[in-house]
Amino acid sequence: MNRGLLERLFDLRGRGTNVRTELIAGVTTFVTMAYILFVNVRFLGEDGAGMPDEAVFFATAVAAGVVSLAMGLFVNVPVALAPGMGLNAYFMSVVLGSGGTITWQIALGAVFVSGLLFVLLTVTRVRQTMVAAVPPSLRAGITVGIGLFIATIGLKMSGLMTISVPPGHAVDPAKGGVLAGDAFLPALGDFIHRRDAQLALVTLAVIAVLMALRVRGALLIGIAVGTLVGVPMGVTDFSALGSAGWLPDFDRLAVGALDVKGALAVGLIDIILLFTFVELFDSFGTLVGTLNRAGLLKDRKQGERTVGRAMLVDAAGVSAGALLGTSTVTAYIESASGIAAGGRTGLTAVTTGVLFLAALWLAPLALVVPSAVTAPALIAVGVL
């Protein structure tokens, strides 16, 4: 594809940018987002919601790649998308907390329906009324609550914190896994004897230092360093790479495995609505914040049209992601890193999308990265 075609397709000159800057911005965005390839496997995979690890990695990479490409080509904005943090954690809790009544296939069906509802709200412009009706304090509360939820899961997965059920308080599957009596006992993990907890501390320290130094891709670099440090500690096992191919096992994919009928039959209306409303507010806030930083909302009417089209792609991406086999796909605030690097057009998002598709070759690495390494990334994201 020649530069002239890219110029016409993305209006590079009109937005004061060039091909080189957009490509660098796309790579920057990918580096800051790529941690989701490994973290999502821990949430939805065999150690989380019970899906095949290869299926989750495939769905994460393809959904992020395809929907980011759509955002870049159809809306021409430098915003990339991928399965969102927070809603993937909620997805896991819905499956694990149901006592076996809600399978991951049914949960995917709920995500698919929420995406269709999101599309309907966007097309009918009801979303504008809904967003305006929610007070800023409630929006902030939702964000903080999701962050604490993610951080708590990260602390538990890493072994830095344990949660025990006190005597007389049993888990009640009929109440979605909520402890009867609404009680649980958090405590510090065993740092002395548990190597995974020690590795999690080291990884968290590396991520914290890199973030303090404003290093782009701090989470991805931290995951890589933690994985290598885990080898002499006996936590990371690279032996699986010897028998693994450099592409996912296509016989274990979850494409089209969602159960929409089951989701509606079980009566997951409250869960579907929660998915929808969190998607709506999260998407709107991220898009307005990133596009404003890119200088694409200066003209009010044009800005409203741009945000509306971007939210439509985001909404369609939710259902597309569920069809592929992953939790809610949403716009990523990490897109701001690419914008800071000069990204102003959809070419940035297209570049990021292509890199996510190319990342399918990294599938075996997702299987060897231990949860003690991905968990600190959850803690960092939750705190932020």
Language model features by range: what are they?
Residues 48-98:
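Active-site cofactor/substrate anionic-group-binding motifs, chiefly glycine-
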Residues 69-83, 209-220, 340-346:
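Membrane-helix interface "capping/anchor" motifs
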Residues 49-62, 102-116, 164-168, 187-199, ...:
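Structural signature of hydrophobic alpha-helical transmembrane segments
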